[in-house]
Amino acid sequence: VGYITQIIGPVLDVAPSPGKMPNIYNSLIVKGRNPAGQDINVTCEVQQLLGNNEVRAVXMSATDGLMRGMGAVDTGAPLSVPVGEITPGRISNVLGEPVDNLGPVESSTTFPIHRSAPAFTQLDTKLSIFETGIKVVDLLAPYRRGGKIGLFGGAGVGKTVLIMELINNIAKAHGGVSVSGGVGERTREGNDLYMETKESKVINEQNLSESKVALVYGQMNEPPGARMRVGSTAPTMAEYFRDVNKQDVLLFIDNIFRFVQAGSEVSALSGRMPSAVGYQPTLGTEMGCLQERITSTKEGSITSIQAVYVPADDLTDPAPATTFAHLDATTVLSRGLAAKGIYPAVDPLDSTSTMLQPWIVGEEHYETAQGVKQTLQRYKEPQDIIAIPGLDELSEEDRLTVARARKIERFLSQPFLVAEVFTGSPGKYVSLLETIKGFQMILPGELDNLPEQAFYLVGNIDEATAKAATLQVEGQ
């Protein structure tokens, strides 16, 4: 037990009772009444031991109404959150408290949010592909099981729909669950994701136990302590499913940049000397501690997809640059493709993956992917000629390449289960083998006689040939 000696915005200095010095990361609870007579209950986390018998703590909720001299109680342990089967379908805050007005989250199991990464001996050393059922991803920028994927793309290019499809597919194909951490993003986006997950039955309101995703939010309006620590709460919930239930888990972090930004605010308020571009001197350590917890063990895996905001489009900024060091793959969403109506609008040439190597994915997959990329690259080069004088100015060979590339571009689109509401066509999960087979038929020209519309928004190649037959009948 101690009392508050100083308050600087979301940061408090507390003088503990003699001989009762709390450890770093312990949570303190400040209770009292504000001048208006309302009860105050603020949880803080110890960040620094200052000497002269004081500690500096960062609050996890607003510090309005706190006063010097108020009592603070040391809980003797780090922040702990409820984990387990009770979390899917619910929205929690950084402390694991529900914020969806559906009653309390009562779990017999709680985990502290500060946990060490799995030991090297527990890691799964085998490189394996994490099949998503999305053609463009599995073929050209495959995800690694237990890997980290950066998701790049502006507003309105289909990021939320892609995330929901992945949540849906991991539940159906891998029997896994997902955890989505909203780190310092707009409250509207968190609300949109919640509403859309309910609409597409990823969250089942009638029977929450059938839900496939747990949501943890620390949005833009929260103090920096909450925005920084929600980046630890979400992985903690995911670790339960990996370590105890031995499942494959998908962890979404939206947005990893805001995690760094919140850490920078806390660092400045704690009085640390800033480093490059005003970021915290501990940037690499904070990022590493979070990212190292996201991995495959021999029991299960956490595969993480992180939306990366690039400030002022500067890839050399310390925040995105530190993030890139940890990524295994990047999925870049393109506004140009979205404008053409090709969804998912994943850019096939800009998206990359360290897994696309012949000794990992196999010779057949690698050759097919390279063929697709080469054809699309050759289609990209004469765009100016196509746009102004028209296709007639191209050589016969180039015209054939363009025709095949346009078929490939359309075949990379796919109807999503969660987007059935918008597209009206049933969603499709396409296995990697079917994807490779389809492109192996388009590349050498086996399907040159089919119209390009036949390849748009279909699942596997058999559906494209069936669609072509239907189009021919309608044409007659």
Curated annotation (Swiss-Prot):
Coiled coil: none
Membrane topology value: Peripheral membrane protein
Cellular component GO terms held in the UniProt record: chloroplast thylakoid membrane; mitochondrion; proton-transporting ATP synthase complex
Record's keyword annotation contains Electron transport: no
Annotated catalysed reactions: ATP + H2O + 4 H(+)(in) = ADP + phosphate + 5 H(+)(out)
A Pfam family reported for this protein in Swiss-Prot or TrEMBL: ATP-synt_ab
Binding residues annotated for ATP, in chain numbering: G153, G154, A155, G156, V157, G158, K159, T160
Enzyme class: translocase
Compartmental location: Plastid, Chloroplast thylakoid membrane
Keywords: ATP synthesis, ATP-binding, CF(1), Chloroplast, Hydrogen ion transport, Ion transport, Membrane, Nucleotide-binding, Plastid, Thylakoid, Translocase, Transport
CDD domains linked to this entry: ATP-synt_F1_beta_C, ATP-synt_F1_beta_N, F1-ATPase_beta_CD
EC number of this enzyme: 7.1.2.2
Record SUPFAM superfamilies: C-terminal domain of alpha and beta subunits of F1 ATP synthase, N-terminal domain of alpha and beta subunits of F1 ATP synthase, P-loop containing nucleoside triphosphate hydrolases
Entry annotated with the keyword ATP-binding: yes
A Gene Ontology molecular function term of the record: ATP hydrolysis activity
GO biological process, one term: proton motive force-driven mitochondrial ATP synthesis
Subunit structure, as described in the record: F-type ATPases have 2 components, CF(1) - the catalytic core - and CF(0) - the membrane proton channel. CF(1) has five subunits: alpha(3), beta(3), gamma(1), delta(1), epsilon(1). CF(0) has four main subunits: a(1), b(1), b'(1) and c(9-12).
General function of this protein: Produces ATP from ADP in the presence of a proton gradient across the membrane. The catalytic sites are hosted primarily by the beta subunits.
Family: Belongs to the ATPase alpha/beta chains family.
UniProt cross-references to HAMAP family, sorted A to Z: ATP_synth_beta_bact
Identification of the protein by name: ATP synthase subunit beta, chloroplastic
Gene it is expressed from: atpB
